[in-house]
């Protein structure tokens, strides 16, 4: 114990030798441990997004192989996506009880390896050749992936000073549009190279990346590193995240903490907005690939590749909007993004040719992914220190419930409009999504902004 403490003090020597006057005059720095943890959590999030979004890119080819109607496909996607919501709140409570910082990082390792291994198995045709077996495996994948999301968000926040939390979560969540983009690129390449019968190959990649990444993360996440990091944060005049002791949720307190967090008006209203926004985000992912294939007449490979154009600006939006949220305020930022999203999704009505489709996707993409880190930051700002992961779990559950509702609704609307080949159903879907974004914005109007004062 003494030698470990000496190791921490030795590491901190170069930091603490700076005089108080010099510290006040110099720019506040972020420790390399924060950057490394952000990179690892970002890569985990890329894998999560890639695997989760892949089934949406493959919608037309899967529907074709199993002869599924729009409503049947919507029901299947809803079942798979709602599985994301099942374990994230109990898993978040368990994660809070296990501990924060380096302990939560260790908690991630078997979780990520578990759901990526199931995904790998779903890519083996000998095992997943039947629709039932494939769907059950994908449900298993999403049970783990949904559990892992709030854990990953909380872990990102716990390696960064509170004043920089919005930035860190914004960068972290750029992993989602990158993962979604990769899902379209890989799906297009696999279908074009190996043929439509080989679509399962797309699910083999995530585990191959996860194994070395999780081995590194298990070795890197230590008590010494987190203690060194927190001392550095103190020395920079910034606010450390909740300490391991204060953030620890005692056994038997989990449900009380959850109910108390759920009664928080800011968190519950933001969760409502999250649910409605996810109907929009999941909806465009469900609707766009079949629209491009059945209505626009593109190939299966092209429809998979061109349905992710909005992720190009989505990455940019996830950096800009969370950064602006510190000076503009979380509440105002979410209201502006909600209005932008409503307009952007309604504009798909005018996407009658390829240049318009690309331009509208790029406009919509500027806010499509931007809101998620701000939702999490809003919940983290409003939650008790020891309930950060629980608050994030509530946001995530609302998101996943919206993700389960959306495919049901979109499949029904496409079927109601005349089926896969009729553009009317897609138009109904676009305007329904625009209404959901507008309603979510109205819910956010009733919240109170608790954005921490920006550090100078």
What is the meaning of each model-derived region?
Residues 55-56, 264-318, 406-407:
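Extracytoplasmic gate region of multi-pass secondary transporters
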Residues 78-93, 308-320:
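Central cavity-lining transmembrane alpha-helices of secondary-active solute carriers
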Residues 113-128, 339-352:
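C-terminal ends and interior cores of transmembrane alpha-helices
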Residues 137-174:
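Cytoplasmic helix-loop-helix junction between adjacent transmembrane helices
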Residues 166-185, 398-407:
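Glycine-rich segments within core transmembrane alpha-helices of 12-TM secondary carriers
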Residues 172-225:
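Helix-loop-helix hairpin linking two adjacent transmembrane segments in secondary transporters
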Residues 207-237, 440-448:
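C-terminal membrane-cytosol helix-exit motif in multi-pass small-molecule transporters
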Residues 331-378:
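C-terminal transmembrane helical hairpin of 12-TM major facilitator-type secondary transporters
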